[in-house]
């Protein structure tokens, strides 16, 4: 049954109010049933016992001697997972009243923050872990990975000392540790519980050597298919992988009481949870410590959990090289010191086009352009929307501003912190909340791009796209996106470019009908047909599919070459103030031209497309918020008027505030809108 606007608001608005319900002043837990699900990957974990009476733990405090296997009572009827869950819950209750600024958010204790970005939390977790290891004199080294999360390799034999060091460093703090086996997460404990927790899970094998090669990935990993980051995120590598290594038979003889299967802990993921609004930074921001296995009698070591760029085996874990992450140097395994071919090491910019339809000066310019063209208005296809002016491509929804730019910038700051500079292309407009002095942001007016042409003011995205290669100081590699396209979760440069600089492009499943533009075609379809025909005439390739509404990875040089080669075909598009059936689509042209000339390759990311006047699509936004399954998504204006503009704006604003609660560094602090947001959050 479609969700009507009132019900939709009731579903989305509680997302922004959860902080209030989940954070009572006395620090007691909020109502879990009312909280939004955490943004963590599914885990293969046995049920945990919550808030129950627990026996004396195998350890009393972090930093004490590691629990011994003989301390584990075989008569306890609960599984190790149930015992650890009960012990963790009891300890969380003790900590909750003693840690300022820490609240319970669903299943974690978390710092309550307002401005923290995911990359800052990832880098912060890495810094804390590396410092704890350095202080304990424990060698470690960064392992490059396509996932944004950081990985550290730990030498064979160092696991007990590492567990003790982490427990001591994070004693009495709301810092968590996921216990990792190859291909799955075993369970989650407080970091201060690590030595005893690992001992409890492995108590059936008291005689197993600390770095036993039985069950190592050396034999089992070679036949596994590389899951890779290329097909979109494996949101957590512990969910849904096959190829778990064989486990040795460690059943103790004649043991009384229940016998639980022993699990081998091959790594730990350390993270300090933080919550902003309803957004939890949890294990996806953690730092992975992998307890590598010895390759004896051969030299080197074998990765315990995930493959490396060189496979599972490396000749040495020496880490004399360094790499800089978040402005800090870290030891890097020597074997990875050389630049790898898949690594992107060139700067990447972003270009965003934006318009504010509420600006009176812009409205006057648009009205004047309408008046000049009114007597030559082209017929309008239904799916383009009907403009009051009667001019094709001039429907109001094409220029509607719902403050999407604010959240588009938040998405880039949160999920693509590697962007060097953002270029905002506007028609002499700047939102009041934008920090135009920020060194990572440049505002580019249309008149600067169209200088030297006879084109007047333009309200045509196609015309603007013909001039993007002229943006001053634009990097050779950049992402082009409209302000209604949002990065949905952390991505890496390799999601958009190959290491050799070649952009990836994202074709849609939609097919443009064969043939040239016809009178009944929409402006969009006509422009796509015109583009396809011009390209086919030049390179002999016909592209049936259009492109997704995505961030478009582009090379400035290819865009400029395309503009020059197709200058005659683009002549009228450059000078068309509104979208018309005679236009070409310049970005589509450049991308397909790059592909036809072997300078662009097809890529894949998980995407979402939502039409804001569709009740069904708006209802799906709640699921997107909860699960965060999209690498990017588009909130497109509809033309069917199923919901009023006011209803659409309310639903979209509620969703975007909940999905991107952390301000970007491009927002002025203390603006009226920010104050309104804070007042709304505090209710």
Model-derived regions, located:
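GT-A fold catalytic core of metal-dependent nucleotide-sugar glycosyltransferases
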Residues: 214, 430, 467-512
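PAPS-dependent sulfotransferase catalytic core
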Residues: 161-170, 608-664
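N-terminal anchoring/stem segment of glycosyltransferases
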Residues: 80-150, 156-158, 317-448, 598, ...
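Intrinsically disordered, low-complexity repeat/linker tracts enriched for polar/charged residues
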Residues: 37-38, 42-43, 47-51, 55, ...
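P-loop NTPase catalytic cores that bind/hydrolyze ATP
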Residues: 568-600
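Long, charge-rich alpha-helical interaction segments
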Residues: 497, 503-577, 581
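Active-site-proximal specificity loops/subdomain of glycosyltransferases
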Residues: 433-474
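Noncatalytic N-terminal accessory/assembly modules of large enzymes
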Residues: 2-30, 71-209, 246-269
